[in-house]
């Protein structure tokens, strides 16, 4: 993953630098999965996906908003648009301003799951408000979570040990154990 400054990363990159970096990573033969930002440029997104798939590399198409969370219907539409690119995994991470926006993120994933979506989703509400999206994903169709083994790389990340404990507890509740 190379996260551009526009989506919360630390470094600026021109579109051609961003494209070249991703293509070099794909062509290196050393990666299994690459993350391409949905709003970088559709031509680049399409090109990266095609190259990655031709080399047997999986693709996460992602969108990050560190300022706010869009309404639930727009989250669903954005996920559908990301899925339509041919992404192997669709990811949206947004910053909630209130608890109802966290619920919107989870409900959007659940709605897609109930409509038969087969593309794995990564659904994250960042910050302290959004911690539950990192721990209860199994309940609403989130397939991946992120934790920290040290310094968090995004707001709201919890330690690996805390996440493991929470995921185990939620799984046992769902499984009726």
Annotate each language-model stretch with its function.
Residues 1-54, 64-68:
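Active-site beta->alpha loop and helix N-cap motifs at the rims of alpha/beta catalytic domains
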Residues 38-177:
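Catalytic alpha/beta core domains of metabolic enzymes, predominantly
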């Amino acid at each position: 993953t190379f996260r551009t400054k526009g989506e919360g990363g630390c470094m600026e990159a021109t579109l051609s630098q961003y494209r070249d970096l991703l293509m070099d990573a794909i062509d290196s033969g050393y990666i299994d999965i690459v993350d391409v930002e949905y709003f970088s440029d559709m031509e680049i997104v399409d090109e990266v996906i095609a190259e990655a798939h031709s080399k047997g590399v999986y693709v996460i198409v992602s969108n990050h908003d560190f300022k706010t969370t869009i309404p639930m219907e727009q989250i669903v539409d954005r996920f559908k648009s990301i899925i339509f690119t041919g992404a192997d995994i669709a990811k949206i991470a947004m910053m909630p301003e209130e608890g109802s926006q966290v619920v919107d993120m989870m409900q959007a994933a659940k709605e897609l799951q109930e409509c038969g979506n087969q593309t794995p989703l990564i659904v994250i509400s960042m910050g302290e408000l959004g911690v539950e999206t990192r721990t209860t994903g199994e309940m609403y169709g989130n397939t991946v979570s992120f934790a920290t083994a040290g310094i968090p790389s995004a707001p709201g990340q919890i330690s690996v040990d805390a996440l493991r404990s929470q995921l185990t507890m939620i799984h046992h509740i769902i499984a009726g154990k």
